Amino acid sequence: MATINVYVFAFIFLLTISVGSIEGRKLTKFTVTTSEEIRAGGSVLSSSPPTEPLESPPSHGVDTFRPTEPGHSPGIGHSVHN
């Protein structure tokens, strides 16, 4: 009798989960404003001035990055002091 109750409970539980995912959420309608509607409400701003190119970061030396033995990695944020 107890095993039947467990199966009934599991069936009802799975049924309620599936019903919740089937219903989902309601989507609301929204209107898309067109460029004509935006221009009618105010003036159009000019585009922003071009930006200056960024400098490339400095290059690193050969000794900056080196391989470590497996199991002996210092980890992120820790330097190796020999």
Swiss-Prot record:
Domain of life: Eukaryota
First and last residue of the signal peptide: 1-24
Gene ablation phenotype (knockout): Larger root systems when grown under nitrogen-limiting, acidic, osmotic stress (e.g. mannitol) and high salt conditions, as well as in the presence of sucrose and under decreased or increased light irradiance. Reduced the lateral root density at low temperature (16 degrees Celsius). Increased root and shoot growth when grown hydroponically.
Location of region: Disordered: 40-82
CC annotations in GO: apoplast
Propiece residue ranges: 25-63, 79-82
Molecular function GO labels: hormone activity
Any one Gene Ontology BP term: response to auxin
UniProt induction comment: Induced by auxin, but repressed by potassium (K) and nitrogen (N). Accumulates strongly in the roots under nitrogen depletion, and in the shoots under nitrate limitation. Also induced by osmotic stress (e.g. mannitol and NaCl). Strongly repressed in roots by carbon dioxide CO(2).
Key words, A-Z: Apoplast, Developmental protein, Hormone, Hydroxylation, Secreted, Signal
Annotated positions of the Hydroxyproline modification: 67, 70, 74
Tissue specificity statement from the Swiss-Prot or TrEMBL entry: Mostly expressed in roots. Present in lateral roots (especially in vasculature), root-hypocotyl junction and cotyledons.
Post-translational modification: The mature small signaling peptide is generated by proteolytic processing of the longer precursor.
Function of the protein: Extracellular signaling peptide that represses primary root growth rate and significantly inhibits lateral root formation. Promotes shoot growth. Modulates leaf morphology. Regulates systemic nitrogen (N)-demand signaling. Mediates systemic up-regulation of genes involved in N uptake and assimilation pathways.
Subunit and partners: Interacts with the CEP receptor CEPR1.
Family, as annotated: Belongs to the C-terminally encoded plant signaling peptide (CEP) family.
Name the record gives this protein: Precursor of CEP3
Species: Arabidopsis thaliana (Mouse-ear cress)
Lineage, uppermost ranks: Eukaryota, Viridiplantae, Streptophyta, Embryophyta, Tracheophyta
Underlying gene: CEP3
